[in-house]
């Protein structure tokens, strides 16, 4: 495991941490039972097979 050689300043630490941002999940269109829906790509196959309840909020 990497170990820092010197102490990192608070300003440098906070500016580095500020680069990490959450991203919205990319939605793709899928037609289920004749109705167009938008689901995350990782749930696309499950939505097509009917394993995911898309009517639930």
From Swiss-Prot:
Coiled coil: none
Disulphide-bonded residues: none
Listed SUPFAM superfamilies: Zn-binding ribosomal proteins
Domain of life: Bacteria
TM annotation in the entry: none
GO cellular component term, pick one: large ribosomal subunit
Keywords from the UniProt entry: Ribonucleoprotein, Ribosomal protein
GO MF term list: structural constituent of ribosome
GO BP: translation
NCBIfam families given in the database record: rpmF_bact (TIGR01031)
Family of the protein in this entry: Belongs to the bacterial ribosomal protein bL32 family.
HAMAP family documented for this protein: Ribosomal_bL32 (MF_00340)
Name of the featured protein: Large ribosomal subunit protein bL32
């Amino acid at each position: 495991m990497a170990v820092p050689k010197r102490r990192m300043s608070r300003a440098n630490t906070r500016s580095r941490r500020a680069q990490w941002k959450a991203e919205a999940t990319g939605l793709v269109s899928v037609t289920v039972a004749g109705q167009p829906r938008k689901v995350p790509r990782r749930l696309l196959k499950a939505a097509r097979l009917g394993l995911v309840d898309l009517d639930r909020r």
